[in-house]
Amino acid sequence: MACMAWETGPRARFTPTVRNAAGSGAIGLIQFMPSTLKSMGRTVEQAAAMTAVEQLDLVREYFEPYRNRLHSLSDVYMAILWPAAIGKPETSALWTQEGRPTTYRQNSGLDIDGNGVITKAEAAAKVRATLEAGMQVPYVYEGPL
């Protein structure tokens, strides 16, 4: 839930039609890239026409290949952002300003310490903050089940 809350943003929380503001073409609850949807036999238009509940089935399908490899919140987010980092240490560099300048630039907002290296921990920090905020009153249901 924290990953979807982060990916859809504060103004469109859990909206399945939200599109990436940077123009990547990504859409939906986990910001599916057009190429990812194509590999799943779907189109951006089909994903955009889904309700949140319908898109959750697509999210489940997307995560299926990773199901036994996700052991932390960071790993779950890496399945969305950079699957090659699943299972790697939190200190692992995802992108560097020198090594992958374009990818670094596209994600430079995740470089918390501004050192030109985006680590797995840095990339997941905003998702973790979203999770922690979501665990605060008034978001936590404490009524009868």
Language-model segments: residues:
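Catalytic glycan-binding domains that act on GlcNAc-containing polysaccharides
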Residues: 1-113, 120
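A recognition module on extended beta-rich or small alphabeta surfaces enriched in W/G with H and D/E
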Residues: 117, 121-123, 127
